[in-house]
């Protein structure tokens, strides 16, 4: 890359590297270097930046960095229609509640600029604004499968192409209607998946009341409406990011007691955001389930708090539009949940249903998860020890079944009636009976909790010790209120820090806690403790450490007799105290 000095060559080089099947970590590193080069502000450079933003979004649920990157490159690429389309699509998919405000600022900004595509950009922004103000379905502005990139060519965007085709169909339909009843057009191409007509930019406000009236008659919101049959034909070809989300809200009485806080339940999600309105119902396997409210979402899935009979459950609903690898991860998760069904350590699966368009998973309902409790702050050491011990027992249960979870993080530990349980087995790996590790084809997990060996290279060996690292990161976050890599603001820096890792900073005054964290976060996987080692660690058992006793005895003797202290005398006193303590404990 050092010998590349123009944007076209740089873009082509990056595409060649992707075609060669490089790892996600390597790809991120290449794009980070590419965006640092000065190669001009043309469409090739823009495409490189947009691909970089996509990588940032693939690596985290936090949209802050991607949003800041869009703002940073705005002055460089505001003259290109593709910049505005990508930025608006990003804000729509991020669910930004201030979309209208952002659009108005963008329109005002473009109006005072002069560039070739100004008219086209303004028409696009004003049409999105009209849709947003009138509560229209904004999915029409989200890109479909991308075609080959040809800078300089005046190619219609996916939205414009669809709008143009629909406008053409409307004219044809009108001609058929005017020619009499013998000439009928069913008008299928005029409708989106939600059943609403897409209008040309100058028709955005037309017939809005009719559209609303038509929707008000539906028993379920668009997110639960039946999809068109042709959606199945695109399965496996439309790239979409499936995110794993937490699915609980509120804090149980037991957790409140531990934290000394109360937390009221949140209000129902807005139907306009795609959530199901309260008290609506859905039929799964012939059984009626009452929707109480939406409690989580991410990618193509949403999670609802539901009532089935007299019991409350969590219902995960996954829209089956995505690559087959991600669908496979959900099937893997279901199989593993059934494997652990009936165990006290794992959230229980109640039932599931795989339909043509949706996957439903009915799960045990939890009041909150560990990430929410950590964000509240001020955790006592007794609470941390209790949760830590439960987490160790959970992971021990998983490891006994020869399974590496690969994505342990606070959001995946759910509190159910005060007891900690594990959720989300989407990317877990099963170890064969004749091995102690697995060969991972790609990086998996969340960077803040990923072990160095999981991110350093493609096809790296990952063993149970990788989960031990993740547990150490979670303990670090419970003790320090932030994960070990919190001081590094972006994904690239986090990965580079892991690759160059020596040791993290520890500010806790609890020496036993620091000791167990350091042991879990050893760079060499072979030097990390086992689950049994951690369960018997003095951080949990309270057993006095001989080394700590030596330090204490030495300090006392120095106070009493000066700087010169006989090391053998120190050892004898420390060992005697240690032996006495063990006898008292017995």
UniProtKB/Swiss-Prot annotation:
Single GO BP term: meiotic spindle assembly checkpoint signaling
Biased composition (Basic and acidic residues): 167-188, 199-217
Disordered as annotated region, ranges: 167-223
Residue ranges occupied by any Protein kinase domain in the UniProt entry: 289-540
Keyword Kinase: yes
Manganese among keywords: no
Listed PROSITE patterns: PROTEIN_KINASE_ATP, PROTEIN_KINASE_DOM, PROTEIN_KINASE_ST
Alphabetically ordered keywords of this record: ATP-binding, Kinase, Nucleotide-binding, Serine/threonine-protein kinase, Transferase
Catalytic activity, as annotated: L-seryl-[protein] + ATP = O-phospho-L-seryl-[protein] + ADP + H(+); L-threonyl-[protein] + ATP = O-phospho-L-threonyl-[protein] + ADP + H(+); L-tyrosyl-[protein] + ATP = O-phospho-L-tyrosyl-[protein] + ADP + H(+)
Pfam family, one: Pkinase
UniProt-listed CDD domains: PKc_Mps1 (cd14131)
Catalytic residues as annotated in Swiss-Prot or TrEMBL: 407 (proton acceptor)
EC category: transferase
EC number(s) from the headed UniProt entry: 2.7.12.2
GO CC field: kinetochore; nucleus
Family named by the database record: Belongs to the protein kinase superfamily. Ser/Thr protein kinase family.
Known role: Involved in mitotic spindle assembly checkpoint signaling, a process that delays anaphase until chromosomes are bioriented on the spindle, and in the repair of incorrect mitotic kinetochore-spindle microtubule attachments.
Name assigned to this protein: Serine/threonine-protein kinase MPS1
Gene name for this UniProt entry: MPS1
